[in-house]
């Protein structure tokens, strides 16, 4: 069951195959970093804003700060949802995903090399078909790199290569009808017995593993298979990041 790679999914992929990934840099003009990431039918705009100075609680520490915000457009999904700003309250899911993105990016930044400067990432989901948080991490990293390179060019930091310690990306995995699969679209995610999001660095270490059993508990063998799938997917996503960043 765990090694079955002959199953063909509804979208024609193998169980260990990513959806088509496209990363477009310089998607908008104003931000220091701006990326559109497309993972299948999921599309997220990720922007990075570099600001000299840090929040009050970080002042005089000699350290920088990286933070993130996540949101979805009202019609990113099949049915319209009100903007959270209109409702007057940021939802728990939004807070959770924003913190996830921030943690993943901070995990590959040398805050001392960044100095007392702040980089804010904004991840706005234009179209959602599963994996929006993982696409946000993967796209936001590329926007972050562009912002750090901008800061070096404008002499806000000494060395971009010192600030950027490693790559980071994230991907979803899950167990569907007893079979572990990589990179779940919404139709699979909604049926998953186990759903997991895994963020990894370019050196193969983990920053985040979020895993939940929905319909039945998962066993140790399935966990190992899911992590193997996530490692494969993240290596391929980081190859896509490198390819996008090599275009200048």
Swiss-Prot record:
SUPFAM superfamilies listed in its UniProt record: Ribonuclease PH domain 2-like, Ribosomal protein S5 domain 2-like
Chain residues that bind phosphate: 93, 131-133
Alphabetized GO MF terms: 3'-5'-RNA exonuclease activity; tRNA binding; tRNA nucleotidyltransferase activity
Catalytic activity: tRNA(n+1) + phosphate = tRNA(n) + a ribonucleoside 5'-diphosphate
Pfam families linked: RNase_PH, RNase_PH_C
Keyword RNA-binding: yes
Entry keyword annotation includes Chaperone: no
GO biological process, one term: rRNA catabolic process
InterPro entries xrefs: ExoRNase_PH_dom1, ExoRNase_PH_dom2, ExoRNase_PH_dom2_sf, PNPase/RNase_PH_dom_sf, Ribosomal_Su5_D2-typ_SF, RNase_PH, RNase_PH_bac-type, RNase_PH_CS
Top-level enzyme category: transferase
Entry keywords, A to Z: Nucleotidyltransferase, RNA-binding, rRNA processing, Transferase, tRNA processing, tRNA-binding
Known EC number: 2.7.7.56
Subunit structure: Homohexameric ring arranged as a trimer of dimers.
Family according to the record: Belongs to the RNase PH family.
Function, in words: Phosphorolytic 3'-5' exoribonuclease that plays an important role in tRNA 3'-end maturation. Removes nucleotide residues following the 3'-CCA terminus of tRNAs; can also add nucleotides to the ends of RNA molecules by using nucleoside diphosphates as substrates, but this may not be physiologically important. Probably plays a role in initiation of 16S rRNA degradation (leading to ribosome degradation) during starvation.
Protein name: Ribonuclease PH
Organism: Bifidobacterium longum (strain NCC 2705)
């Amino acid at each position: 069951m765990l090694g079955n790679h002959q199953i063909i999914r509804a979208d024609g992929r193998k169980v260990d195959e990513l959806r088509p990934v496209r990363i477009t840099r310089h998607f908008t003009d104003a931000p220091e970093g701006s990326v559109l990431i497309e993972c299948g039918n999921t599309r997220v705009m990720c922007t990075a804003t570099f600001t000299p100075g840090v929040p009050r609680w970080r002042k005089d520490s000699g350290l920088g700060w990286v933070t993130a915000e996540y949101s979805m457009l009202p019609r990113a999904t099949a049915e319209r949802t009100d903007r959270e700003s209109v409702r007057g309250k940021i939802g728990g899911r939004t807070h959770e995903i924003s913190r996830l993105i921030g943690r993943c990016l901070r995990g590959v930044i040398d805050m001392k090399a960044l100095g007392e400067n702040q980089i804010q990432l904004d991840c706005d989901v234009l179209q959602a078909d599963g994996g929006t948080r993982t696409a946000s991490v993967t796209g936001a990293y590329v926007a972050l790199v562009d912002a750090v390179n901008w800061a070096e060019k404008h002499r806000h930091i000494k060395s971009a290569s010192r600030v950027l310690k490693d790559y980071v990306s994230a991907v979803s995995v899950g167990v569907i009808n007893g079979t572990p699969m990589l990179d779940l679209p919404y139709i699979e995610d909604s049926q998953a017995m186990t759903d997991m999001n895994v963020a990894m660095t370019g050196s193969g270490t983990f920053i985040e593993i979020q895993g939940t059993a929905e319909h039945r508990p998962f066993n140790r063998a399935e966990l190992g298979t899911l992590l193997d799938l996530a490692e494969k997917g993240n290596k391929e996503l980081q190859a896509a990041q490198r390819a996008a960043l090599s275009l200048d």
